[in-house]
């Protein structure tokens, strides 16, 4: 069965936009088309910002877009000047290839840490969220698809073997000893067996 590709829903919900607009006391009624137009404008803005940031990321030969890439993009593009205050505290870009967190070849890739995540004793994994906190059913399905696809898409790199052979520790085999209880079995109450015999006779007759 082929793995189904996740469809990304990059739409900003107009109903949520309308609620945000109505939190302002000066805004009265809102026409139905207004939140839809704002939603589309947000999509186009993000598309533009991310394309420019992607170009910056690729120019640095990095595999992961970071906040430093976004900061450089915002500083280079005049149309994003209004965002400069937001990225003022973000550290500047370092030299080419010096950023360890940008190069995928340096260091192990993000994978599951042994013992820190995943399901233990039937518990939720680290990506599991409380259904009350999650927004809609489609978001919950998307989250479950994320957890399914994470295992397929990402394969952690195996670190290179050291020059020393791995040490194998063996303990001497222990002889098989059947488990026997050392506690004495309490005797049955003396009056309990006699009524049972009488009840069985009643059922037979």
From Swiss-Prot:
PTM remark: Phosphorylation reduces DNA binding, but has no effect on heterodimerization and TBP binding.
InterPro entries from the UniProt entry: CBFA_NFYB_domain (IPR003958), Histone-fold (IPR009072), Transcr_DNA_Rep_Reg (IPR050568)
Histone-fold domain ranges (all copies): 14-77
GO (cellular component) term, any one: negative cofactor 2 complex
Subcellular location field: Nucleus
Annotated Acidic residues bias: 138-155, 196-205
A single GO molecular function term of this UniProt record: core promoter sequence-specific DNA binding
Family statement drawn from the similarity comment of this UniProt entry: Belongs to the NC2 alpha/DRAP1 family.
PANTHER family linked to this entry: DR1-ASSOCIATED COREPRESSOR, HISTONE-LIKE TRANSCRIPTION FACTOR CCAAT-RELATED
Function of the molecule: The association of the DR1/DRAP1 heterodimer with TBP results in a functional repression of both activated and basal transcription of class II genes. This interaction precludes the formation of a transcription-competent complex by inhibiting the association of TFIIA and/or TFIIB with TBP. Can bind to DNA on its own.
Name of the protein in its database record: Dr1-associated corepressor
Organism, as annotated: Bos taurus
